[in-house]
Amino acid sequence: MLCSCGAEKNLKKAEKYLALGEYYDAATQFKQAYTKTSPKEREKRGQYALKMAYCYEKTNSVQKAVAAYRNAIRYNQADMNHRLAYARQLLKTADYKQAATEFKAVLDSMPDNTLAKNGLVSAQNAPQWKKEGSRYTVKRMDVFNSRRAEFSPVLAGDQYEKLYFTSTRNEAQGNELSGITGTKPGDIFVSEKDDKGKWSKPEVVEGGLNTEFDEGACALSPDQREMYLTQCQTDPSYPRYAQIVTSSRADASWGKASLLEITRDTLSSYAHPAVSPDGQWLYFTSDMPGGLGGLDIWRVRLTSAGLGGVENLGEPINTPGDEMFPTFRPNGDLYFSSNGHPGMGGLDIYIAKPDKSGHYVLEHPGYPLNSQADDFGMTFEGVHNRGYFSSNRNDGRGWDHIYSFENPEIIQNVKGWVYEQDGYELPAAQVYMIGDDGTNLKLSVKGDGSFEQVIEPNVRYIFLATCKGFLNHKEELRADKTEESKEYVLQFPLASITAPVLIDLSLIHISEPTRRTPLSY
């Protein structure tokens, strides 16, 4: 009798935490309720196990989630949706054989279920994908990592000498542990690379950017003067949802972040911002109504007057599963992570490349960029296919860490410099790039007056540099096909419209005046 009363007390606490989205605390209470309940009360035990499994999923405690689902199945409390969730967790443990068995059982009852279909494809093909491998190489970057979590790296600086990322390490602000994750709330940290290429010890970003709440998954505008980031506030009385906030940089310091109101829907989450290379669109993750299920990737236009309308990216990017962490390669390729497409388990990274008609074509980059765990948050070192990403592979606690990646490839790119004729850089300039293959881009200029862009062989390009107060400057370029990477350098010295221009009058011929009749006007 005493055990039963104790279990009810734990259950009441667990349901309260669950309603607030505090999954770590909820899982702890559900586990205690489960332990205090007699095995003879099979229905109760099975229901508690289901709640535990759901909370463990949310906190990335994969092995605990698998064990909880097995208990729910043992007590005959798991329906086919629970069996589907169990199978998807098995993928994350690389137990592909058992996962395939579960997916087949689900498909016997729900033959049209997209997640079960894609899950079975994953379970049947992942071992071969891992065996085949790819040209990617990955390496764990311990210089950035701690005994807690680090994720969503973002390279910054004119020479990509800064790396921003989120971490829940001890140096993060706040003293209380999060009821959602069981760790300290995350803060934005930064590491800087010296002239010898050595990265410094990460430090929390000073100023008003970080708070006692969770800050994470940041992105920068093309001019790197605006930061978009995810913030998760908490409240003991009602659930709070992730939101996107913005911070402006004054000199070297980031200011206090302010809310970016994407819609007036306060019951949906908005997270994982990414800015398109042309600076015209903000991509983000949300569970707002109108999606394909789970978390979807959306976008909203950025204008001088504010935000435009919101668009769901739709198929083939979004699925009934979760699509998250959009990022861009400078060439316009969209990278994102999903657990709804066929993959190796957990969140896999996918590449969405627009074809000539503007529709996206998806590519799975394979192993080792992807693994059975969660892989996400790509950032690139300029035009090169190298940089950093985050993954919780090989971490028993499910915590994310930062890895480097590189995929050697033949790249032809142009690097340009826009400056005054006197020599000073013009970071306020814009460069328009037009190719005879239909290319029509507006390129942003960095703080040192430079820009970079990948180009295709056998295409004739025209580059036009413009800046308020200066005359335009045009350059033309055509790159031949080559067997190795090559960089073309273009110079754009702009003349001021106020600077005096010397004219040699001896070169001007003045003819005799002609008498005009009224009809000649």
Predicted features, each with a name:
Residues 20, 85, 92-97, 108-417, ...:
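Short, conserved micro-motifs composed of acidic
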Residues 33, 71-72, 105-106:
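Canonical positions in the second alpha-helix
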Residues 436-450:
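Short, acidic Ser/Thr/Gly-rich low-complexity loop/linker segments typical of extracellular
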Residues 505-521:
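Residue-level detector of conserved catalytic or cofactor/ligand-binding positions
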